Design a protein with these regions (language model features):
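UBC/E2-like fold recognition across ubiquitin and ubiquitin-like conjugation systems
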Residues: 1-125, 137-349
């Protein structure tokens, strides 16, 4: 896979104008040293950058459909190779949000991607894993993307992310909301899909991703419901995209997860402290008294639910303690490779 992608990369780079050629060298650490937080940013990129794109060592557990064809059409292979080039050199890599890709060692049409969710959201710094498959009809049809971080099929992290792993996105043809960008065989790419997941799904107020709920924006009731939804999402994120990732990382992203959280430790704990403080403030807030429509009805004051925020504060506090223990524990040794199967006994004479 990497050999085919490398050939496509060299051809594309040679054909591109000098100003638009893909830069293949890593940016030198410290090149942006004048920027705030540049040291932490440079250290993160130096540690996680070399791990952004690679073949999976063992893809035996991947669920794979039948191969696209015994001998895929050359145009299909060329387009897949170009997709690999784009992903291998253009995935986002920042403290605020990053992505990593692993390729099936013998199938160009199968990838696995890990995304660290953006800061400023209830998903911040959590690691979410997705399977990507390119159908035989690609690029006429979009790739299929399935989320694997689902709390073992129990958690819906977003109106666009289902417990079964379904990802609803207009680019994928799985969502038909207004204003969504649809798949274009000539111009749409997997990289575009991944960036859309980061920007359009992992958002600060996921409650409003539900069609029709945007009408509640800016109202006391809408703000209250959005805050409760985000609070519940944050609990799920800490439990499944942080704690469970540290305890049971996907084998192909084990080192990514370890290094990511080693570099993001202080941010993650501070972000949780801020969320706990916010829950404490909401729990202690007096019930608003206002004339007009009943409480909890559109146009009226927000419901007063100190018990929800009390429970949320207690849950986050417990999760934070569990997470800090994992973050401060010495790294666990990588599991030993499985022993080869013993040879079959010789047939009797």
């Amino acid at each position: 896979v990497r050999r085919l992608a490398g050939g496509a990369q060299r051809a594309a780079a040679a054909a591109a104008p000098p100003a638009k050629r893909v830069r293949t060298e890593d940016t030198a650490p410290g090149a942006d040293a004048a920027a705030p937080g540049a040291d932490a940013e440079a250290a993160y990129k130096a540690a996680l950058g070399p791990l952004q794109y690679d073949d999976a060592d063992d893809a035996a557990q991947w669920r794979l459909p039948a191969a696209a064809a015994p001998r895929p059409h050359p145009a299909f292979r060329r387009r897949l190779a170009q997709e690999h080039v784009d992903v291998s050199h253009s995935l986002p890599l920042n403290l605020a949000s990053s992505a990593w890709c692993r390729c099936h060692p013998s199938r160009m049409d199968a990838l696995r991607v890990a995304i660290s969710a953006p800061e400023g959201t209830p998903y911040a710094a959590g690691v979410f894993v997705f399977d990507v498959r390119f159908p035989p009809s690609f690029p006429a049809a979009p790739p299929s993307v399935t989320m694997l971080t689902t709390g073992r099929g129990t958690v819906r992290f977003n109106p666009n992310l289902y417990e079964c792993g379904k990802v609803c996105l207009s680019l994928l043809g799985t969502w038909e909301g207004k204003g969504g960008e649809t798949w274009n065989a000539e111009t749409s790419t997997l990289l575009q899909v991944l960036v859309s997941i980061q920007a359009l799904i992992f958002v600060s107020d996921p409650y409003y991703n539900e069609p029709g709920f945007e009408a509640q924006m800016g109202t006391p009731v809408g703000d209250h419901r959005a805050a409760k939804y985000a609070a519940t999402v944050r609990e799920h994120c800490v439990r499944w995209a942080m704690i469970d990732q540290l305890r049971n990382p996907a084998p192909e992203f084990r080192e990514v997860v370890r290094l990511h959280f080693a570099h993001r430790r202080d941010f993650v704990l501070a972000d949780l402290d801020a969320a706990i403080a916010d829950a404490t403030r909401r729990e202690a807030a007096p019930a608003p008294a206002a004339p007009g429509p009943p409480r909890g009805v559109a146009g009226g004051p927000a419901p007063h639910e100190p018990q929800f925020w009390r429970h949320h504060r207690a849950t986050l506090t417990e999760l934070r303690q569990d997470l800090q223990r994992l973050l401060d524990a010495p790294p666990a040794p990588a599991p030993a490779p499985a022993a080869p199967a013993p040879p079959a006994p010789a047939a009797p004479a």
